[in-house]
Amino acid sequence: MVTLITEKLQNQSLDDLTCKTYNINLYSSEKLNKSGSLFSFEINEDSPWKALNGGCPIQTDARNSAYPFPVCPFSTGPASNGALQWQQEPSSTSMVSGWISELNLNENSGQPLAPPTKRHCRSLSEPDELARCRSPWKPGNSKVWTPVSKRRCNSGGSATLQRCNSHGSATLQRSTSISLPQNILSLNNVFTVTSFNTSPVPRPSSASSGFVDSSEGSTSSSTRWNSGGPCDFNPRRRLSLSQEHITETGNLLPSANSTPTSTPELSRRQGLLRCRSQPCVLNEKKSRLKRRREEDVRWNRPSLDFFKMTRTLKNSKSLCSLDYEDDDDDTQMKTIVSSPCDSNDLMNIITPGSSPMKEQLDEVRHHGSCQGSFKTRDYKKAAAVCESDEDTSDCESTEEGIFPLDCGDLDLEQIENN
């Protein structure tokens, strides 16, 4: 529309301006408020430019009125016509073309355009419902909002808020992502904001707000959320309930038949930390509920009998039947080998410094005197068996008991297998 008028004005000459007249429709302040247009005049191609009262506003009044131009380039015509003719000035064409580019032109002269939808007006920085909560408000005295402690499950369910009136009945239950109402006055009985800039010292538990269970309801109609002073509601602050807002040890009135074992929340609420940085501290001390056992009861480990274990180990390695019952009396008692062939000979007591290889060689030597059919390879096998037993430990070779050997007790197959 603006481009069409500017093109027409550029094509016209100064001589054409004397023949044509235009009307400008000036609106009063009352009509301007009703129409909602930004400027007090509109341009129509059909009708000439008219003044509303048949005259041009004076230059001094033009700046104070809704007409935005300081200079009036029109000369008043006859009162019967009510028309305003252009003054024949060479600079009027450029001035009018500059004015028309600044006009807000409406095709419908009487009715303004419809307002755009909400999705075009909504800001992307913050939600629409939180943008209404900028103005400060005071707590109402009619109803009390008591937030229920959040029960957060691991599956990601939303916590709920219950609104309890003075009669104690829950009237509203919504999720935490509620859309705030449009009227700011209806928010007076929803929340009360505590001022955190009153003192840097943390307040005692008596100064914090009380917690009322939804089953019992509230007995008084006054608000229990204390506000230390006027504080603006920050829409970017998360609508979460810290421990300071929901617990008060003085207002916790347990029922008569409640015991610490039946209601463990009574003892657990008093030991919670008063921390504002964490949104929910109710799940802090769940680890102590995993295992309950008394500290006085101790389960003693069974004592290990190493003597029986060593006896079993030695019995499994021995070639013959061994007797260990008399070994504990004398630790210096060493292996006594009796000669199996001549029982009248003295028993050879082996000193600790003597090697067990000599013992086994003497054994084989006595055994060879009884049975002369031994071959040389049998001696080597017997010596190898003794060496393997000697490598295990010196204690086993020195602590073995007394065992008699007969000629029939030694079995060659047993020696080869071991």
Swiss-Prot record:
Residue ranges annotated as motif Nuclear localization signal: 285-293
Biased composition (Polar residues): 248-265
InterPro entries: FAM53
Alphabetical keyword list: Nucleus
Pfam families: FAM53
Described purpose of this protein according to its UniProt entry: May play an important role in neural development; the dorsomedial roof of the third ventricle.
The keyword Nucleus belongs to this UniProt entry's keyword annotation: yes
UniProt protein name: Protein FAM53A
Segments of skewed composition (Low complexity): 205-229
Compartments, record wording: Nucleus
Family: Belongs to the FAM53 family.
A biological-process GO annotation: protein import into nucleus
Main location: nucleus
A single cellular component GO annotation: nucleus
Species, as recorded: Gallus gallus
Chain segments carrying region Disordered: 198-236, 248-269
Keyword Zinc: no
